[in-house]
Amino acid sequence: MTHPTVAVLGVGAMGEALVAGLLRASWQPSELSLGVRRTERGEELHDRYGCSWSLDPVEVVNGRDVVVVAVKPQSVPHLLEQLTGAMQQNQTVLSLAAGVVTRLYEDALGDIPVVRAMPNTPALVDEGITGIAPGRFAAEQAMEQADVILQAVGGVIHLAEHHLDAVTAVSGTGPAYAFLLAEALIEAAIREGLSRGVAERLVNQTIKGSGALLVETGKGPFELRAQVTSPGGTTAAAMHILEGRGFRALVEDAVAAAARRSRELGEAARRVEE
């Protein structure tokens, strides 16, 4: 499909990752407009990407096919107050705000197509994964627009909206789990006598390569782990410690806490709107 023109409201880490990804994917700067809160930030982004910007969200969204909301969840109600009456039914809202349900946008803006999305930070290097779900008025065209935009920074999975809090907890938060594991492995390597530089190179490539095995071989994690776990070997000794000390339960508890917090953020945004 033809590139939809895009307004990005909120150009923090994720918003900027999307802008950069779209430009790499052959969008032109003239096809993007950016909404910022500070003049200095707008000028910085214009110098870097050549896109127009404004402090006024109404000006930013005017005439754009898709409006990406990439502000913090608690900022959504105020943004919707500013946009009330400013959007047309042929525009699509693509919300990246964690926990904020499509109904909140629909109640504020009317019968406008809303697609809720949860990306993750590997989008910075075009290796992201995003779960998306349609609101009540988001038909095929709106979902196609969301697809083509988000595919510029990685993969896209279509889901029902009630699954997106789980997506937030698994893939949205997931990079932090991987980074924490990397931190722990690096520190453990240093305690075993390796230099930090060597430890970082070993750990970073090991995590990258393990992810590639999962993606490219089609084998599941259990099978891949079994392949490197010989009875009585070094990997078996390590797995015994991790399993015995509740590694799985810790991960499950962490995911549950993140999903719960996603729901809480959505509830808080609804209370502010009311």
Question: Which stretches of residues belong to each language-model region?
Answer:
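A short glycine-threonine-serine/GTX helix/turn-capping micro-motif
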Residues: 167-176, 225
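Rossmann-like NAD(P)(H) cofactor-binding subdomain of soluble oxidoreductases
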Residues: 39, 48-49, 53, 57-132
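Short acidic capping loops at alpha-helix termini that bridge into adjacent secondary structure
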Residues: 29-32, 89-91, 197
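NAD(P)-dependent Rossmann-like dehydrogenase/reductase catalytic/cofactor-binding core
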Residues: 2, 204, 208-274
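Catalytic, metal-anchored helix/loop core of enzyme active sites in primary metabolism
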Residues: 170, 182, 271
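NAD(P)+-binding Rossmann beta1-loop-alpha1 motif at the extreme N-terminus of oxidoreductases
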Residues: 1-55, 59-62, 190-191
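Internal alpha-helical scaffold of NAD(P)-dependent oxidoreductase catalytic cores
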Residues: 104-113, 129-167, 179-216
